[in-house]
């Protein structure tokens, strides 16, 4: 895991650059063809002669599987290795794939002595012309792509090293019918975002939507990464916080999209927290009846919650998120480097959603959090990577099974019935979402117990985690009447009845539970001291 896999056509420089990169980074180097030959006790040419290409490809897949068991290695794959879908999936699982390219004439010059290359025994330029187009389509799906034309291996390896993700890389699939996409989780991902946009947009226009807070920290590095990939993008800023989700902010995005000539083939990039993602996603959902967008969340809350699932919305005076649409992004990149400068209160707010998703879906994750919460609060990098990976994987699985929230996905609303009501009663923007959800979870946990649906162990465990995370330090100050009115406006209420997600036990929740309003009110009064 966390290997760098070099792919590219014969003669693109994988072995030479790979050795340079290994020397530069202090990592072991593995040449896949050399490993295959050593295992077989024969040259690659002899394997082709004795077993044919099909036999060689089977050996190649086995050799790749063995090589990928290494940690932090530089692996030079064969030119045809990534063409097998199963090989490609293995390469991308926890590893960074880097493609090296060269012009056909340069490849022909480098390959003029094709010793040991069984597929190059005939006319070399013709062979390149026949094989390269199909292979190039796969190479360009790599995380990073570098041309080796006219550049020394040391220079290429330096550029690769500067752009590699750091400290591990995870990809989580969200298999929504007709809109499947991935969440990439790691550190130092701006260059991976740039390459993805290069694939998606080609020469089409791109606009980055951010807010004043995120832009001040993160826009310039992203734009620089885009420029290094040969991409230009317009930048449009919306107000920070919940003000980003007002109709007037949405209107300014529409105006900027028009001014920049963003058409149906254009791409919108959301760079910011949950509010930016919500309004930018809603703009993408409605501009020209829907354009593609990429989520680049910069807060923990957005990484583990709002960026996943395609929910987009703006606020109205009558309530939070009342005007919205489900519009899936084409990719999500959660760069944990952004969390290093995140305010402590914002980081803790994101922890509420991590605790929530563990409580409703994965007891082992709850156990992990109980042990590792101190490290997580200290922003230990391996702890952050593991927590975000697990939280994203849980939500991605739920969304894949229920993309339109007609059933199971409702469990992700645990704590949100009261949480959203608290946000509205306090005034949007005055109470952080995670803090509101934490208190909403406290209420829902008590309701679970008092209604006979839950267990004392679950409520105690929840309370301990929320308290240790610093999420219960200050009770929200709201008026009783305002809170009750907000509850009645909740989207999950039906025919005036209050419906809750209740915690059945650690790792399991029930949704759509109708609760006696008197019990709700009594519990609110006790938990919130109303």
What are the residue ranges of the model-derived segments?
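A glycine/threonine-rich phosphate-anchoring loop and its flanking beta-alpha core
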Residues: 140, 282-375
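A glycine- and Lys/Arg-enriched "phosphate-lid" helix/loop adjacent to the NTP-binding pocket
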Residues: 93-137
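Conserved glycine(s) of the Walker
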Residues: 13
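ATP-dependent small-molecule kinase phosphotransfer cores
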Residues: 28, 32-92, 116, 125
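Active-site segments that bind and position negatively charged phosphate/pyrophosphate groups
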Residues: 368-481
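NTP-dependent small-molecule kinase module
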Residues: 16, 20, 24, 70, ...
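C-terminal charged capping/lid subdomain of soluble metabolic enzymes
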Residues: 352-355, 453-530
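ATP/NTP phosphate-donor binding region
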Residues: 168-267
């Amino acid at each position: 895991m966390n290997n760098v896999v070099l792919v590219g056509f014969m003669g693109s420089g994988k072995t030479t650059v790979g050795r340079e990169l290994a020397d530069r980074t202090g990592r072991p180097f593995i040449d896949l063809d050399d490993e295959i030959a050593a295992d077989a006790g024969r040259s690659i040419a002899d394997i082709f002669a004795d077993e044919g290409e099909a036999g060689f490809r089977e050996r190649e897949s086995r050799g790749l599987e063995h090589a990928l068991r290494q940690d932090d290695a530089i692996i030079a794959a064969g030119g045809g290795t990534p063409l097998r879908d199963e090989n490609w999936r293995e390469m991308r699982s926890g590893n960074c794939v880097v493609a090296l390219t060269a012009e056909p004439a340069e490849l022909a010059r480098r390959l003029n002595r094709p010793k040991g290359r069984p597929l190059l025994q005939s006319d070399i330029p013709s062979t390149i012309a026949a094989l390269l187009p199909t292979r190039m389509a796969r190479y360009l799906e790599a995380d990073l792509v570098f041309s080796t034309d006219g550049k020394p291996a040391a220079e290429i390896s330096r550029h690769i090293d500067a752009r590699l993700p750091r400290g591990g890389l995870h990809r989580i699939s969200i298999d929504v019918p007709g809109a499947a996409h991935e969440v990439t989780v790691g550190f130092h991902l701006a260059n991976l975002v740039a390459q993805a946009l290069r694939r998606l947009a080609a020469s089409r226009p791109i606009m980055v939507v951010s807010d004043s807070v995120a832009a001040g920290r993160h826009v310039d590095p992203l734009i620089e990464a885009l420029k290094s990939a040969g991409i230009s993008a317009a930048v449009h800023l919306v107000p920070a916080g919940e003000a980003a989700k007002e109709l007037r902010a949405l209107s300014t995005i529409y105006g900027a999209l028009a001014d920049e000539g963003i058409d149906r083939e254009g791409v919108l990039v959301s760079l910011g927290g949950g509010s930016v993602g919500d309004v930018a996603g809603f703009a993408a959902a409605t501009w020209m009846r829907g354009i593609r967008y990429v989520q680049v969340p910069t807060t923990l809350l957005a990484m583990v919650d709002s960026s996943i699932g395609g929910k987009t919305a703006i606020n109205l005076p009558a309530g939070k998120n009342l005007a919205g649409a489900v519009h899936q992004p084409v990719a999500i990149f959660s760069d944990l480097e952004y969390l290093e400068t995140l305010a402590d209160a914002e980081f803790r707010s994101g922890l509420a959603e991590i605790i929530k998703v563990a409580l409703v879906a994965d007891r082992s994750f709850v156990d992990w959090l109980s042990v590792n919460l101190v490290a997580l609060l200290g922003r230990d990098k391996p702890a952050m990577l593991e927590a975000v990976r697990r939280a994203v994987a849980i939500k991605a699985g739920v969304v894949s099974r229920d993309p339109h929230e007609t059933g199971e996905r409702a469990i992700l609303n645990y704590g949100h019935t009261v949480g959203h009501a608290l946000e509205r009663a306090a005034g949007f923007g005055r109470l952080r979402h995670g803090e509101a959800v934490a208190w909403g979870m406290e209420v829902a946990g008590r309701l679970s117990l008092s209604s006979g649906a839950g267990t004392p162990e679950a409520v105690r465990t929840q309370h301990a985690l929320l308290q240790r995370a610093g999420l219960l330090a200050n009770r929200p100050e709201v008026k009783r009447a305002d809170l009750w009115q907000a509850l009645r406006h909740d989207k999950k209420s039906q025919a005036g009845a209050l419906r809750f997600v209740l915690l059945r036990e650690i790792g399991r929740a029930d949704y759509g539970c109708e609760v006696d309003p008197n019990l709700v009110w009594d519990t609110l009064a006790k938990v919130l001291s109303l």
